[in-house]
């Protein structure tokens, strides 16, 4: 079973980018509430 490296990277980025974006918003919100 071949592993398509580009497809793997694209999938990882597709998951990590929105996750990082939500984490940044969460941290900013928590910091403002302090």
Curated annotation (Swiss-Prot):
InterPro entries: PSII_PsbM, PSII_PsbM_sf
GO CC aspect terms: chloroplast thylakoid membrane; photosystem II
GO biological process entries: photosynthesis, light reaction
Residue stretches in coiled coil: none
Membrane topology annotation: Single-pass membrane protein
Subcellular location: Plastid, Chloroplast thylakoid membrane
Subunit structure and binding partners: PSII is composed of 1 copy each of membrane proteins PsbA, PsbB, PsbC, PsbD, PsbE, PsbF, PsbH, PsbI, PsbJ, PsbK, PsbL, PsbM, PsbT, PsbX, PsbY, PsbZ, Psb30/Ycf12, at least 3 peripheral proteins of the oxygen-evolving complex and a large number of cofactors. It forms dimeric complexes.
Family: Belongs to the PsbM family.
Entry protein name: Photosystem II reaction center protein M
Organism the protein comes from: Piper cenocladum (Ant piper)
């Amino acid at each position: 079973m071949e592993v398509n490296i580009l497809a793997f990277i694209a999938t990882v980025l597709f998951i990590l980018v929105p996750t990082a974006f939500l984490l940044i918003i969460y941290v900013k919100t928590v910091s403002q509430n302090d």
